[in-house]
Amino acid sequence: MEFTLQQDKVRALDDDMLVVKSESGGAGLDRGDDESQYPHGLKLAVLMTCVFIGMFLVALDKLIISTATPAITNEFHAYSDVGWYGTAYLLTNCATILLFGKLYTFLDVKATFLSAVLLFEVGSAVCGAAPNSIAFIVGRAIAGLGAGGIQEGVLVIIVCAIPLSKRPAYQGLFGAVYGVSSVIGPLLGGAFTTHVSWRWCFYINLPFGGLVALAVFFLLKVPGGGAMKSSWKHKVKELNIEGLVALLPGVISLCLALQWGGFTYSWSNWRIILCLTLGLVLLIAFIFIQVWRPKTATVPPHIFCQRSIFTGFWVSALLGAHQTIIIYFLPIWFQAIKGDSAVQSGIHLLPFVIAIVVSSILTGVGTTKTGYYTPFLIIGTVTAAIGAGLFLLLQPHTTTGQWIGYQIVYGFGLGGCYQAPNVAAQTVLSKDEAPVGTALILFATTLFGAIFVSVGQNVLDQQLATKLAGLAGFDITPQQINTAGVTGLFQMVPQGLHNAVLYAYNSALRRTFLVGLILACLTILGSLGMEWRSVKKEQQKQQEKAMENEQEEAAKTQKHKYALDTDENFGV
């Protein structure tokens, strides 16, 4: 009897200690923002450099394939598979971001990140060594799985390695890296394809990915490893399986519809209607599941409904949408209207890249100094909207100085927007919930970016078909325009109509940029709704809360120890 009672009390002590650990840090991420516990100097510099290299590779992989695709299709003789080369990566990347956001809250942070890097490396190796088109597509899908974990993992590592008051500067670098890689990707893809082989677009990931893995393995230290102290049965329950069953196929179905619609199949095709319907139904089901089971939800309702998280989601979704439209269709303007090659059009985006980098760094430094990120977000969204509006002024006779100026204004605005939603998530949420918040922000950017590439392309095709229909002796469908490509359209028209087609193409592109302008203006509403919270004040609150938790934990431990000692003394 004495032994049984003693066992029960020890078990109660262990259970209470488990609860205290969970409350004080959840996933073991909480250091109380005592800056002495974070890495410093060379160790921090090497860790963050390598982590950002990983982010650069993931973002690079989205667009590096754009200029390599012709060489890949020529080698595999699989022209019907072209759409899958980009879609396979996008589907798995977008579908797993929220999943990894949940995993980082209760699994070992280092092990989870390294697993994502391994998936990305395996996928890259399969792509580089692919003997046929099917193997290449499988490799792209595997790489996309890892990419979702790396993207979210970089933000989690920033939380683990850097105190809150200093994170904005690194978040600024995060935005700069993402923006630079989005533009440099096609340039590197073209360079590798022309001078070495398209396979090096993917082999290049292997040594750099290995460097990232080594740096994280040896330099990243997370209290308790970041893993929730609970059984695997409890961890599986925390995974919200029923929610994932709705989320993953829902996102995949929606992305498939958007990738195929208007390109591979018409929007009225049964496949597109089925994918759209299935995707929307499953995503609605996912939302209901989150409300129904909030304790194990992938995205707990109390997180999404928090004011800064909701407005951050709004800003990120619309930001991802309008920046994708501008980045995707501005090179088309250079190629179709100015006669640039694909590589030249990429080079002409360098003013945009430089503006993003400078603005991101300045915004990060400014936020670190003042403690407030909301004013920079408001200024950034307004400036980006002005820049998006300037693209409506583009004409065939637009001078070099003008289009450079338009890019600088727009890029400077974007640089001021990138970091605020993520910093807000890390500021208003506890450290164990921050991965879910940042994953939600990334998911919004990725999903809406994918949606509005398709929207923009369909606007361009429809507008161009309408404007060309008015030309005497010339009739063309949106499908024929899409098949002809950027410059192929001019080869389909009589020489005497080239100038008219040029102005029609320019007008259609301006209508597409108008979509970007509308989205950029709507982004301002989200920035105005963002809470004014200081990272400096929140860090102080976290330090005080961490101290209180430590005192409560010590008191609870002492209380149970006293209870056990008392029972022993009385022979219970």
Swiss-Prot record:
Location(s) in or outside the cell: Membrane
Entry GO CC: plasma membrane
Gene3D superfamilies assigned: MFS general substrate transporter like domains
Span list, region Disordered: 539-572
GO-annotated molecular function: transmembrane transporter activity
InterPro entries in alphabetical order: MFS, MFS_dom, MFS_trans_sf
Biased composition (Basic and acidic residues): 539-556
CDD domains associated with the record: MFS_Azr1_MDR_like (cd17502)
Keyword set, alphabetical order: Membrane, Transmembrane, Transmembrane helix
Membrane-protein topology: Multi-pass membrane protein
Protein name: MFS-type transporter MYCFIDRAFT_190113
Organism annotation: Pseudocercospora fijiensis (strain CIRAD86) (Black leaf streak disease fungus)
